[in-house]
């Protein structure tokens, strides 16, 4: 179940992937002005269509939205299948050592 998009959740998702508002707007097709007003917590709401576009853009970037389930909504990055720009498998942080650290 996807959580309700809140200004705080949107800011967290942007921080996770390093996007500025203009990046989020470009990737989602939702205007910078609307995203900025939404994030300001001034009572501006996103329509279900706009929220869906925002969710889709961030999910494409690897963000996983976590439903509340009693612990609070949140975001995390999906574990990459392979390294960006290569065919090599990505190593988990705990698997890195001096012999495989480039």
Please place each PLM-identified region on the residue numbering.
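Short alpha-helical DNA-recognition segment
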Residues: 19-37
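DNA major-groove recognition helix of helix-turn-helix/homeodomain DNA-binding modules
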Residues: 29, 48-66
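Short, solvent-exposed alpha-helical "recognition" segments
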Residues: 41-48
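A detector for short, charged/polar N-terminal pre-domain segments
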Residues: 1-5
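DNA-binding alpha-helical recognition surfaces that contact promoter or target DNA
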Residues: 9-12, 26, 37, 56
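Short basic helix-loop element that most often maps to the first helix and adjoining turn
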Residues: 9-23, 83-84
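Short, charged recognition helix plus adjacent turn
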Residues: 63-100
């Amino acid at each position: 179940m996807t959580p309700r998009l809140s200004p705080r959740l949107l800011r967290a998702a942007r921080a996770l992937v390093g996007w500025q508002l203009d990046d989020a707007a470009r990737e989602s097709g939702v205007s910078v002005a609307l995203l900025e007003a939404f994030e300001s917590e001034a009572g501006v709401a996103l329509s279900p269509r706009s929220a869906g576009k925002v969710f889709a853009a961030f999910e494409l970037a690897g963000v996983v939205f976590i439903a509340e389930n009693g612990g609070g909504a949140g975001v995390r990055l999906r574990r990459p299948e392979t390294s960006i720009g290569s065919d090599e498998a990505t190593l988990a942080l705990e698997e890195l050592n001096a012999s495989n650290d480039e």
